[in-house]
């Protein structure tokens, strides 16, 4: 149980920190803003995605939130990360830009697996 707890909080904390950092860059970095424009997105999408990442990261971090709220956060992040990987590949970005979201998807999957294990242990 303790090992599962450590793995869950380590992966969830790392993932959430990266999503919060990413969201902050959406609001503060002219380079990130230019990249969204280059990929054909309107500015409102960048802001919406930044807000969604902040909310999702907080949902993952708040311990007393259980059930479908966390499931939706996990699903939303999964879709976002897969989409980011495909998008970076389709616009000809360096391969690292396509692989990075998949690495974080792996961290997200580990977090989800251990969240489920912790839920089963408390039932």
Model-found features: residue ranges?
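Membrane-interface extramembranous regions
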Residues: 1-123
């Amino acid at each position: 149980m303790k090992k599962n707890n450590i793995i869950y909080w380590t992966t969830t904390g790392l993932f959430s920190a990266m999503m919060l950092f990413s969201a902050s860059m959406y609001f503060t970095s002219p380079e990130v803003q230019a990249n969204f424009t280059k990929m054909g997105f309107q500015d409102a999408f960048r802001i919406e995605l930044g807000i969604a990442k902040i909310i999702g990261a907080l949902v993952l971090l708040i311990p007393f939130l259980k059930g479908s709220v966390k499931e939706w956060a996990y699903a939303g992040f999964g879709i976002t990360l897969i989409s980011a990987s495909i998008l970076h590949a389709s616009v000809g970005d360096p391969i690292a830009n396509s692989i990075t979201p998949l690495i974080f998807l792996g961290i997200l999957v580990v977090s989800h697996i251990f969240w489920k294990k912790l839920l089963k242990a408390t039932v």
